[in-house]
């Protein structure tokens, strides 16, 4: 035990010869992993990158981390207790265990659901945005941009009002018979896209997140609720929770135009085939044609082709690469979380990524530049000289988290 010979158990009656294990090859890109850990220094959050074509996890960063040498030697018990007591929770693998509001990255999944259910189409209807969604005394704020909007500019500008209207129309559509029936259809689409349940990655401890169903709302509201009651879920807030792995997987699904392979760390097992779940594609309940519309919106968020562009910085960091992206600014009791989901290049994509920086503010503040630098490293094998300077600056940025329990 712990490297010390203790003698034979039951005089060796149960002893068995050791069986050598199989050699494993991981899909982790060591340079990408090192860059991610560097960029998240002095911050709390996670980065997950996936190769869309294979589902291989290219990097999985959780910050803060800890020195594994603390877990050996005579002080290992004491060290483990100290790590458990640390308010920053370094033992928590936030990439698969952190359940966060996905914020506006979730609007892409909403768009696909509304398209599939024929609540919206690419060019119509257009929805108004007077600095937010306003209906029957309810206001959900939004930033300034053109109005009214159709789907692609709504994704590019991350318009809250557009997606509030979409959810309100779906949950009030008479074809479903009731909001309860509508949310059941809605949830089934979300689950098929990888939310609400564990994806089944080959690491222990994965959390499922949360996609609410009709019963979730029927109990507190005694069955009397509608789209306005739950409007915040339209923009990835309210009761919606997702892991960074699930958000990255959504990016990979969109990059593939409608399928994903369960994300996995192990690339190869010596003399063995990977389990079929890590080889065979899974198909959401969304028709392939609708993914192209969301791709256009995510591309417009970077290149500004529809006017305002929430991910414009990604284009500046990766000139010449057709990056597709979606920011998220997830509301929180303290400062908002900074989120980014994207993939590159637009056609024949090589990498899909999710970045989540707790209390980092707007998605463009931390999520977008970190995500773009990670894509630069992977696509080109190294950072450009300009991005190397930028990476050093970001690695030295410190987010102060105070003394609150985390």
Q: How should each PLM-predicted stretch be described?
A:
Residues 40-43, 76-78, 370, 388-389:
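Short intrinsically disordered coil segments
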Residues 181, 366-373:
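A general alpha-helical scaffold signature found inside nucleotide-binding enzyme cores
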Residues 4, 11-13, 53-105, 109-363, ...:
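Beta-lactam-recognizing serine transpeptidase/beta-lactamase-like catalytic domain environment
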Residues 7-46, 50-53:
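Conserved, well-ordered alpha-helix/loop/beta-strand core segments that scaffold catalytic motifs
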Residues 31, 35, 185, 293, ...:
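Charged catalytic carboxylate motif
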Residues 275-282, 370-406:
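Short, gly/Ser/Thr-rich active-site loops of penicillin-recognizing serine hydrolases
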């Amino acid at each position: 035990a712990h490297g010390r010979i203790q003698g034979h158990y039951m005089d060796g009656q149960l002893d068995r010869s050791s069986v050598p294990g199989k050699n494993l090859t991981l899909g982790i890109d060591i340079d990408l992993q090192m860059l991610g850990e560097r960029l998240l220094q002095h911050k709390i959050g996670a980065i997950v990158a996936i190769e869309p074509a294979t589902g291989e996890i290219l990097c999985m960063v959780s910050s803060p981390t800890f020195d594994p040498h603390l877990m050996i030697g005579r002080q290992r018990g004491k060290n483990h207790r100290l790590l458990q007591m640390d308010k920053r929770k370094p033992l928590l693998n936030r990439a698969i265990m952190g359940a966060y509001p996905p914020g506006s990255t979730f609007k892409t999944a909403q768009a696909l659901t509304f398209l599939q259910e024929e609540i919206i189409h690419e060019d119509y209807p257009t929805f108004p945005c007077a600095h937010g969604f306003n209906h029957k005394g309810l206001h959900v704020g939004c930033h300034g941009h053109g109005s009214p909007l159709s789907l692609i500019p709504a994704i590019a500008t991350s318009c809250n009002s557009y997606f509030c209207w979409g959810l309100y129309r779906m949950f009030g559509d008479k074809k479903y018979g009731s909001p309860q029936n509508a949310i059941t259809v809605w949830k089934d689409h979300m689950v098929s896209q990888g939310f609400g349940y564990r994806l089944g990655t080959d690491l222990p401890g994965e959390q499922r997140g949360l996609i609410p169903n009709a019963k979730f709302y029927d109990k507190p509201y005694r069955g009397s609720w509608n789209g306005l009651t739950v409007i915040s879920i339209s923009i990835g807030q309210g009761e919606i929770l997702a892991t960074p792995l699930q958000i990255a997987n959504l990016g990979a699904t969109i990059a593939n135009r409608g399928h994903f392979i369960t994300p996995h760390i192990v690339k190869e097992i010596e003399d063995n085939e990977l389990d079929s779940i890590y080889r065979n594609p899974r198909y959401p309940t969304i028709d392939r044609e609708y993914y192209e519309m969301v791709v256009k919106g995510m591309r417009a968020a970077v290149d500004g082709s529809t006017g305002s562009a929430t991910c414009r910085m990604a284009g500046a960091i990766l000139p010449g690469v057709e990056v597709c992206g979606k920011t998220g600014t997830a509301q929180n009791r303290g400062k908002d979380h900074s989120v980014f989901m994207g993939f590159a290049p637009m056609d024949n994509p090589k990498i899909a990524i999710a970045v989540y920086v707790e209390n980092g503010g707007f998605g463009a503040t931390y999520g977008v530049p970190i995500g773009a630098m990670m894509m630069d490293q992977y696509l080109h094998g190294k950072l450009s000289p300009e991005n190397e300077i930028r990476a050093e600056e970001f690695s030295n940025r410190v987010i102060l988290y105070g003394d609150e329990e985390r």
